[in-house]
């Protein structure tokens, strides 16, 4: 998984629009 440079501790990943998802409080792209 590649880190997307976004955390998802308090708010969801905005980067989900480019295929990222929340894992361990950080957004990753599979």
UniProtKB/Swiss-Prot annotation:
GO BP term (any one): defense response
Cyclopeptide (Ser-Asn) crosslink location in chain: 1-30
InterPro entries assigned: Cyclotide, Cyclotide_bracelet_CS, Cyclotide_sf
Disulfide bonds, paired cysteine numbers: 4-20, 8-22, 13-27
Coiled coil regions, renumbered to chain: none
Record keywords: Disulfide bond, Knottin, Plant defense
Entry annotated with the keyword DNA damage: no
Tissue: Expressed in pod but not in flower, stem, shoot, leaf, seed, root and nodule (at protein level).
Description of post-translational modifications: Contains 3 disulfide bonds.
Function: Probably participates in a plant defense mechanism.
Family, per entry: Belongs to the cyclotide family. Bracelet subfamily.
Domain comment as written in the entry: The presence of a 'disulfide through disulfide knot' structurally defines this protein as a knottin.
Protein name: Cliotide T6
